[in-house]
């Protein structure tokens, strides 16, 4: 059983009650040792990332993880009362009840899922879908009990699931989309997106998302629905083709059409990965791991986002989060511990002036790479975390 352990002496953890006026901007960062370290370690750090805080860059809490878990991404359910951590190394999900403190890790067995990647939760907060890149299937689960309820696989030429990674859901049109990315050992690459029926998990159709004929090996990696778009529009990052695509929903035919909307290769960038939208949905941010940029788009027309500018981050630019007031963008710079794409820092960008304020090197300096960054929801309005945790 995985247990949450607090090293009160060695880590110097101290929890204090703070006044409501004590503003905090806390991030969850799962991390792992950089290559070549004598002892491999994984964990989840809770870090203060507010540039105006006296605790900026400090780790307030550290939650150790098994060193062979290979924790990958962090996802929330719809009300952000629960966090899920996917694992590349084991057929398990980890869950944290964010409304209970101290935080406790709970293991969810998903035996049909190998190399679990991304997770989405239905809009009614009752069902989750988990992509399994190693076993080429998708697992549906009960989001209340966190028990798997259905394993979805398909091999028909017109509707199949192969190396699924990215996933997006829109219950308004009863659709789930999953990308076909790469075989975990990188010996094969996909070039398609598959559409599922959200209520049943029925596999409906598969569509090529690439500028060349199959096998294009474009490796679509992430797919997201653009907020507030009517008709619904998805955006897709093609990791190995270095392009951004859009899928537009047709209410009459109840089908998507797909088209390329930007080319990162022309910008001398490679490996587009994650996407992020602001609250209004009129801004889109796309990271590229080579050589490390975040691209800003005017997303007023989601069917054709307009490129505004690229801001240099660091090699391995991957996940990003916005501060609640959308003044700051934080970019986590590490991609699978890969050489040349694992800087290990967190870049802080001032969006008011479109400039880099600096980097948080806390994990990097200790010999670790962050794998994901998410803002920690505040379910304790009158409390705060204060600590000075040193990683060894």
Regions found by a protein language model. Name each.
Residues 18-20:
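N-terminal signal peptide c-region/cleavage motif recognized by signal peptidases
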Residues 12, 22-392:
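Predominantly soluble domains enriched in secretory-pathway, periplasmic, or organellar proteins
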């Amino acid at each position: 059983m995985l247990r949450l352990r607090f090293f009160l002496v060695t880590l110097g953890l101290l929890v204090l009650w703070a006044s409501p006026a004590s503003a905090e901007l806390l991030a969850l960062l799962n991390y792992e040792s950089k290559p070549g370290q004598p002892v491999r370690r994984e964990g989840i750090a809770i870090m203060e990332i507010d540039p105006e805080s006296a605790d900026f860059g400090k780790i307030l809490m550290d939650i150790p993880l098994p060193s062979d878990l290979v924790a990958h991404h962090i996802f929330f359910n719809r009300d952000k009362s629960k966090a899920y951590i996917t694992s590349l190394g084991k057929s398990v999900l980890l869950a944290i009840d964010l409304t209970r403190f101290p935080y406790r890790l709970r293991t969810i067995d998903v035996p049909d899922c190998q190399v679990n990647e991304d997770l989405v939760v239905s809009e009614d907060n009752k069902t989750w879908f988990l992509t399994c890149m190693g076993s080429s299937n998708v697992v549906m689960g009960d989001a209340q009990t966190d028990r798997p309820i259905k394993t979805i696989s398909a091999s028909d030429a017109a509707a199949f699931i192969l190396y699924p990674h990215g996933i997006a859901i829109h219950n308004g049109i009863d659709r789930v989309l999953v990308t076909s990315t790469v075989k975990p050992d990188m010996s094969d690459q996909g070039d398609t997106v598959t559409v599922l029926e959200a209520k049943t998990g029925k596999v409906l159709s598969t569509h090529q998302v690439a500028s060349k004929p199959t096998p294009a090996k474009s490796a679509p990696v992430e797919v997201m629905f653009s907020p507030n778009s009517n008709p619904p529009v998805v955006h897709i990052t093609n990791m190995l083709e270095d392009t951004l695509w859009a899928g537009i929903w047709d209410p009459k035919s109840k089908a998507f059409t797909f088209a390329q909307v930007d080319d990162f290769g022309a910008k001398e960038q490679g490996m587009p990965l994650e996407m992020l939208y602001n609250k209004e949905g009129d801004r889109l941010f796309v990271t590229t791991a080579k050589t490390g940029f975040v691209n800003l788009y005017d997303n007023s027309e989601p069917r054709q986002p307009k490129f505004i500018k690229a801001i240099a981050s660091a090699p391995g630019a991957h996940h990003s989060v916005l501060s609640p007031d959308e003044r700051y963008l934080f970019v986590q710079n590490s991609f699978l511990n890969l050489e040349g794409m694992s800087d290990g820092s967190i870049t802080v960008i001032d969006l008011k002036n479109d400039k880099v304020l600096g980097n948080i090197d806390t994990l990097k300096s200790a010999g670790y790479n962050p794998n994901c960054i998410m803002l920690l929801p505040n379910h304790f309005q009158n409390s705060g975390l204060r600590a000075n945790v040193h990683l060894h």
